[in-house]
Amino acid sequence: MVRECVEESFGPKKMTKKSIVDSCKKNKLYITPHLNDILYLNYSGYNAIESLEEYVGLKCLWLECNAISEIKGLEYQTELKCLYLQNNLITKIENLDSCKQLDTLNLSHNHITRIENCGHDILPVLNTLNLSHNYLKTADNLDHLRHCNFVSVLDLSHNRIEDIAIVKILGGMKELRVLTMTGNPVVNEIPSYRKTLILECKNLTYLDTRPVFDRDRACAEAWKRGGYEEERKELLRWKKEEQRKIRRSINATLRMRHRGDGEPELLKTSSDEEDEDKASKCGKDMSSMLEINQKTNEQAWAEVEKMFCTTPSATGSSGIFQRFATNRGGGADGDGEVIETSEEDIEATIEDIKAVSPKKLIEEISSDSDGAKENYDCKPDEVIAKPCSEKLIEEIVIETAECDSGPSSPEYHEALDKPIENIVNLTNESPLTSPSFDTEPRTLIEEIEPTDVEEEQQIEEQPAPKPLSKNMEKVMSTEKEDDTLNVLIENNEEISITMESKDGELISKVESRPPSTECKKYKIVSTNDVDNSESEPTDITNEDQEYRSSSVSVTSSTDSSDSEDLFDKIVPNKHPKLATNYRQDSTTSTDSENEVSPSKPPIKLEKEKSIAECIDEYKKFFKAAKILESDPEDESSTKMARPHTAKAKRTEPIIYEGVLRNMERNSNESKIAEARTEAKESKEKVIDRLIEQQNLVDMNLEEQNISIGGQEHDFNEYRLEAFRKDQEKLQCLIDRVTAQKDLYNAHIDQIHNQLANIMEDYDQIGLKLKKVDDFLENIKEEPKAPETPSIESEEEIPEELEVHSSEHEQEIVENDNLAQQIIEKIISQSVKTSSEDLKSNFDDSSESSDSAEEDFMDSIRPDHNLLEILTSPKPIPILDPELIPNVDNEFQRDPVYRKFIEIQEEIDKLTEDELYDIVTEATGEFSEEAHVEHCLNTQVDQYWKQYDDIEEFRKNINLDSHPIIQKFRQFIRCHCENKYPGEVDSTIDNLDKACRKLERRLSNQLFDEYLELSRKMSVATIGGESSANEIELIEVDEEENDVEDVVKKITAWVEEQVQNEIAELNEERAAHAGEVMQDTEDVESKPVEIDGTKEETVDSELADNCD
């Protein structure tokens, strides 16, 4: 009990039903197992998953932070969707076949080395797979991901992946959306890692810690097409498109705001190429705007009135300002309201203007600001008007007198005497060509059609054309439509004055065309128009234009700023409180550049100078002008309506008479020169700065120090050091390859040596087997039956026999003596046996015979069958060593017999079991290295196949001719090589011994076969008589059981045969003494031929002994 408590407290915890129920109670789940769809078994120390058979309804199983080493025990969780096994000891993904609905599998922080068993065939709906913090390394370990067709979220972070082939594997996952690869070495190995993975994974939306937007994919594709330059261009295009979207959304919001007031769309579209410096300039003006907003509108109007009342005239100007004062309205935002006029005050206003000054208040829509800059090298814009006695002619009057001349000046009174209908003064002289103003007014035709003399003078006086700046070219190319001034005259004809560039100069062209509704117009407004009448809003609006010039930074009156209002168009921009929508630039130029200051010195009052500058800059704020036709009688009906809301329609500003005088007083010639000088200086500065930077950049990198890792390095030394390191790496690689190559060559040389030794052994075995085959072929040849020699053949003795006759005389004599003794003994025995009983004789003879005869007689006793005796493998002892003492000497001279005796002696010493034991023992010595040697044999076979077929080679040496050779060849194949070179000699010795033993055994078996064949083929007859060896081949019927009859027949046959052979032997001995016996192959079967006669002495002696 104590041990169980200790194991439960400290040892690995086992997952039991009781522990699972306790976990359910702890987490407020159901005690009934099948009612739970989620189960928390985490942080419990379990070492195996078990006892979950009853929880068949689980959909989410938490098993993290345990000691689980194997995934099993989930056979009954068929509805499982989420399985969390992180922070365990799992080494293999397995046993998930039953979880077909698994959607999320978390196996992070385990010991997994290979991804397997999670393909679409096993987990068909797997969507999320987390394998972070494992031991994945090569692409082979990750190749199974190709079969995960529905995995869209994959986490492989913090593994050991270092094979860049994983890019192709991830590219094959068509549904992959989210990928995490941080913490792997391959991240640093893949060039342009993020772009490469975005290009390979077509549907990837999130990579590592950042999302993949359409812009990232487009930039990656551009990088693939044209490198980093194409990527930069694509990124710039996307940025511009995003800016356009932002502007469109803002403009849409502003349009909705204006539409709410019942107004048309009057928003200005921002330029795509708007300078970024405007934002910084707006920031600089913020400080001044704060000071401006602190003042009230009443104070601002008071200051404006003081500016224009420095030289008041009678009651006219005061009346005007009184009207303005009564009609102005102020708010907290500094916006003014448009002054309304009434029909009743039109005539009164005209009279006031006549009394004060010949100038009229003109409502004007200024031309584009680009026209101001284009007036440097061309004629001033020509404003056209046509006099008419019945109608009010719309005109622009430019006063040539000084503003400070006062009402007492003659020019001032002369201007007062002129009727307003006859005042048409148009100044056409450029400040560059005329030192003073032309006081004579010019007619409309003179303005439109200048004389040839004037044209020639203008061409001669004009300076050499200067190239326009890039900003000017940009403006001219993008806003050609703004360079045309359309003017309506009396006969409903429209005169179009177009400014075109030619050779760096701007040339005005005048065209006559039908009137257009979109032309720019000028309109005369009397002082009576400035009234509090509540008429309907007018339809006079400004056209939306964009200011692109870098030297002019002006915000149009139709801009979408919340602080703008119509009232800033009514007053000059002198007072910033009343006109806060203007941003001043130091390089601004105006339309007043066309005017030339008179010979009188300019006014030195700072207030008046500031007013002139402000008015000059204010004139370029407008873009268009309208000249409307109106009859004198309808002039009183002309009204200006004020909108009812703060964000109302835009109306054309009204310019004061005093402002016009100040505009004429000061010339912009100095400003033009200053602007040109500044432009030239800025251009020179830019060029100098570029040249200076180019000189500072020395392209000779070899003489410069480069920064690497925060330290300076000499370029040459660093390059040499890097080259040296690369060379060392290359040399190390070459050394490794060379060492491996030497190892392979040594291994191949060793194989060659072993094969050479084996081939030598094969050659020796082949030679020996060839000798055996030749020997067998000689044995198989049937000997021809010898014929009875005639007298002539007896006389013809071969020379070889004569040569060897002397050497064998003594042997023949001994043989004759031995044959005589055998014959006499046989005859004596045959006489004795004839008188006695056959059985008793048989017993006596068997008892008194020698050891050889006893063996033979024992074999033919009545209890043995004669057929069994004759067919017995044991050879019959037919030789009596006492009677034939010198027979061995005769056969020892025969080489075949000697070989047979040697083989027989070896076979007697070494049995088949012993040979088998030797081979088995040799095989057992190499059993431990069988696998390695088998691989080596395979390499040897592959090496030799390119030269010859080894099987055909072995067949050629006749190794398959015998089963023993096949067995031994198998032994040689398994043990022909050694693992260590020192064992080669011992293996060769073992093989040599085994070959020798095999040769002996083979020779023994082959010689036994030879003996069997020789017994069957040794029936040699002379005249139809059989030899003595026929005794062994006599077939006895199984029914013949009378041994006595058989013995009688044999005895009679032997006696008759002996007598005949003795006579023939004596004759042969006398005639052919010393003849050499030839082809003596077997003692039992080969007859001895002397002079063509056949001796069968041994068989006859055996027969006599048997008798």
Curated annotation (Swiss-Prot):
Keywords: Cell projection, Cilium, Leucine-rich repeat, Repeat. GO terms for biological process: axoneme assembly; cilium assembly. Residues 258-281, 428-487, 500-608, 780-810, 834-855, 1070-1107 are annotated as: Disordered. Transmembrane segments: none annotated. Residues 428-437, 581-597 have a biased composition (Polar residues). It is found in: Cell projection, Cilium. Residues 446-459, 531-544, 844-855, 1098-1107 have a biased composition (Acidic residues). It comes from the Eukaryota. One of its GO terms (cellular component) is axoneme. Signal peptide: none annotated. Residues 500-512, 801-810, 1083-1097 have a biased composition (Basic and acidic residues). InterPro entries: Cilia_flagella_integrity, Leu-rich_rpt, LRR_dom_sf. Residues 549-560 have a biased composition (Low complexity). LRR repeats lie at residues 34-56, 57-78, 79-100, 101-122, 125-146, 150-171. One of its GO terms (molecular function) is dynein complex binding. The keyword Amino-acid biosynthesis does not apply. Residues 184-223 form the LRRCT domain. Belongs to the DNAAF1 family. Cilium-specific protein required for cilia structures. PANTHER family: LEUCINE-RICH REPEAT-CONTAINING PROTEIN 46 (PTHR45973:SF9), PROTEIN PHOSPHATASE 1 REGULATORY SUBUNIT SDS22-RELATED (PTHR45973). This is Dynein axonemal assembly factor 1 homolog. It comes from Aedes aegypti.
